Amino acid sequence: AAPRSPYRHLELCGIANKITDYSNIAVSRCLKGYDGMTKILFVCHGNICRSPMAEYVMKDLVRQSGREDEFVIASAATSREELGNPVYPPVRRKLAEHGIRCDGHAARQMTRKDYEEFGYLIGMDRMNLSNMARICGGDPEGKCSLLLAHAGQSGDVADPWYTGDFEATWQDVNIGCRALLKELTEKK
């Protein structure tokens, strides 16, 4: 039987938010015990700003809703530029303002295997979606979407790396994650 919390299980496997040459294989092996769970992978360019913000916001929303044992939530990058780096300090501070911790995060790159393992691959902008499709060899199962599309919006999540506006990114991520959680829990 799978442990109650997939996050704790990934920590026990020694791979939660760690980047090694074997981390993607280890994540895949650990996720096999969670076949009945909703698996979400948030994706951005570097996995240090928007996608980890979405990962930790969604984990917090899921925890608040008492559904921790129904979801596996992670994040990844489309690029290799920031591999192994922690959450960008201003993002860490923005999360902390809202009582959300992101300790131990290390950026990792999305792989084709993630397409098989996760039911939902959520990009932050159109370029992310394009790169996700390239990495995965397309999106034949329709698993890839933009975060804000779940909130009925056609725009991209503001990228604070360029804008410096971490509050705007927080607002976008919060709106998108709340809408996504509502959508997914209504399906169950």
Where would I find each of the regions flagged by the language model?
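Extreme N-terminal basic, low-complexity initiation segments
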Residues: 2-9
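Cationic, low-complexity basic patches in intrinsically disordered or flexible, solvent-exposed regions
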Residues: 12
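Short, Lys/Arg-enriched N-terminal segments with co-localized hydrophobic residues
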Residues: 16-36
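Phosphate-binding/catalytic loops
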Residues: 120, 126-188
